[in-house]
Amino acid sequence: MTRYTRIGLTGANGTIGRVLLAGLGAEYEFKAFTRRAVDFPSTIVNFDRAAEVEGAFEGLEAVIHLAADPSPMASWESVRDHNLEGMYQVLEECRRSGVRRLVFASTNHTQHGNTILTTPETLDPTKRIRMRLDEPPNPDSMYAVSKLFGENMGKLYSQCYGLEFVGLRIGWIIAEDDPTTMCGTSAEDYMRAMFLSHRDCIEAHRRALEVDTQYLLAYVVSGNGRRVFDL
């Protein structure tokens, strides 16, 4: 098994990015990318701008791509620029720079249309579906569609250019790392199904960097009592 150590991390200033830097920083040599100056060393790149992306991944063995508009309510314009164009530019830079593996932050929302919901962040707790990766996607938002685009672009680059691709359909991770913060709110049942702890997020990305695969999709949620994905 090839071990990758020089890792690019886009969207490093987001919740997941900070969790990974804290949890994996001693194991990997990270090059962090952000859109603006932050309180840790980073390279500023807008990934929807080709001129800024070119050369960004030189010397890297793998990239964890988190940068995107993360909101299920995101507008088409934002999704188009940050999630679609950004994904294309990241894949092209992986190809140009010889990056071996891309770990892509996809989302649980790619299959939310298989549940009864009123908004992308509510679930009907009376409907129990163990959704599986081999089922057709059923996105609930433009955001979810953009993540399916990323998964399929990853498949194309895996087949055509040999890029190893791991797409993680991530649940709901919060900075507080405490699902009880949603108790009594409309999002409580959603959180009980989708919560992803910091510990499990770190372990999932470690395994995504290490697993022997050419192309892989995986659910990434904690062992929640009300989970709707077949783990």
Language-model segment annotations:
Residues 4-26:
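N-terminal Rossmann NAD(P)H-binding glycine-rich loop of SDR-like oxidoreductase domains
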Residues 35-50:
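Rossmann-fold cofactor-recognition segment
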Residues 46-82, 93:
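NAD(P)H-binding glycine-rich loop region in Rossmannoid oxidoreductase-like domains
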Residues 89-140:
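Conserved Rossmann-fold NAD(P)-dependent oxidoreductase catalytic core, especially the SDR/UDP-sugar
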Residues 142-149:
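Active-site helix of classical SDR
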Residues 145, 166-170, 185-207:
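Substrate-positioning beta->alpha
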Residues 151-176:
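Conserved beta-loop-beta element that borders a ligand/cofactor-binding pocket
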Residues 182-183, 217-218, 223-231:
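Conserved C-terminal active-site "lid" loop/helix of NAD(P)H-dependent oxidoreductases
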